[in-house]
């Protein structure tokens, strides 16, 4: 763990479970990481691995049939230390933090915007609640945010409803809403999924400006390893509710020591290697969340697995900044 002065958010042994029909889905099962001020932590992994649930837990936006079973979520606000997991989900203190100090860009813009209010109203609502701006200043700021997101004719679009926006424009409106109050922590869940590459570059540049100008800490959830290589300072690889490997971007991308990390990297085509390059898909699929394998969750899909993998490995420090949860990490590191 880093010095607390450099940490914006610290998650320690977090466990978030879902309960349905007398069954329990351990969606997040003992996750620990730090997000440093002015740095980007990229969280990668297949769908269903617990990335979005981790983000929703930090924001206290979990559904009714879910519970934080154990762990801490510590938000370092100036000189104050706030345990988010102890706050009421819709209590006054959590509402003050959410959207202002910690903001989130949601994965699905189609359902995140309210269809009965204009897009401008929904962005302005955040500014009205969390700032001292007057109506004219709020409107100017809202138009400026839409302009920065590359939305054409923002003076007109600000008064239009979500159905008038394309999918990509709705995504950009959601990003504008999240960036409105210059948050201390920005959680971005697949923020550029519906956007073309030029707009993606523009959005990532804006996120970079937040880091540079306001020392914002960013948690970026993505499947795109190219984005990870370009933007990440630190990387956490998740699989079935656990972080299986974490470290600096250089550690994880250049020296992967968990078979899942290596499999993810091997499954991505590399520009410049030509059409005959060997791309290796990950065999099998993620297990049923209600019928998990014993021990290492990746073992049924792993080429290195043996009997030792019937017991979940402890976290091992490869270096001061590089951690892995695997019995076979030495073999993989040498491979």
Task: Give short role names for the model-derived ranges.
Residues 72-96:
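ABC ATPase NBD Q-loop/coupling interface
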Residues 81-82, 248-335:
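Charged, flexible cofactor/metal-binding loops and thiol motifs
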Residues 136-151, 158-159, 254, 262-266:
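ABC ATPase nucleotide-binding domain helical subdomain, centered on the C-loop/LSGGQ "ABC signature"
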Residues 160-165, 169:
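Conserved ABC ATPase signature
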Residues 180-184:
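A short, proline-enriched helix->beta-strand linker immediately N-terminal to the Walker B motif
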Residues 187-191, 195-277:
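P-loop NTP-binding/switch modules centered on Walker-like glycine-rich loops
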């Amino acid at each position: 763990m880093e010095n607390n002065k450099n940490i914006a958010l610290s998650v320690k042994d977090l466990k978030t479970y879902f309960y349905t029909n007398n069954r329990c889905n351990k969606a997040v099962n003992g996750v620990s990481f730090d997000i440093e001020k002015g740095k980007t932590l990229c969280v990668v992994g297949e769908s269903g691995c617990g990335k979005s649930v981790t983000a929703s837990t930090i924001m206290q936006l979990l559904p009714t049939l879910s519970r934080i079973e154990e762990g801490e979520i510590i938000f370092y606000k100036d000189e104050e230390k706030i345990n988010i997991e102890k706050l009421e989900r819709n209590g006054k203190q959590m509402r003050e933090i959410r959207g202002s100090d910690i903001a989130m860009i949601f994965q699905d813009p189609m359902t995140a915007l309210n269809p009965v209010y204009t897009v401008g109203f929904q962005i302005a609502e955040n500014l009205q609640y969390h700032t001292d701006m007057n109506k004219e200043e709020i409107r100017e700021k809202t138009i400026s945010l839409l302009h920065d997101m590359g939305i054409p004719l923002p003076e007109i679009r600000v008064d239009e409803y979500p159905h008038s926006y394309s999918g990509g424009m709705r995504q950009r409106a959601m990003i504008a809403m999240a960036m409105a109050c210059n948050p201390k922590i920005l959680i971005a869940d697949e923020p550029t999924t519906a956007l073309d590459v030029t707009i993606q570059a523009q959005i990532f540049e804006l996120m970079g400006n937040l880091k540079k100008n306001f020392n914002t800490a960013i948690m970026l959830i993505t499947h795109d390893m190219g984005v990870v290589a370009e933007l990440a300072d630190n990387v956490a690889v998740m699989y079935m509710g656990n972080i299986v490997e974490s470290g600096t971007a250089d550690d994880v991308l250049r020296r992967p020591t968990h078979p899942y990390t290596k499999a993810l990297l091997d499954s991505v085509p590399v520009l410049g290697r030509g059409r005959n390059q060997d791309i290796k898909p990950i065999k099998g699929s993620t297990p049923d969340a209600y019928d998990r394998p014993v021990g290492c969750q990746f073992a049924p899909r792993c080429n290195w697995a043996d009997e030792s993998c019937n017991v979940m490995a402890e976290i091992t420090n490869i270096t001061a900044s590089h951690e892995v949860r695997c019995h076979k990490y030495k073999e993989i590191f040498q491979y």
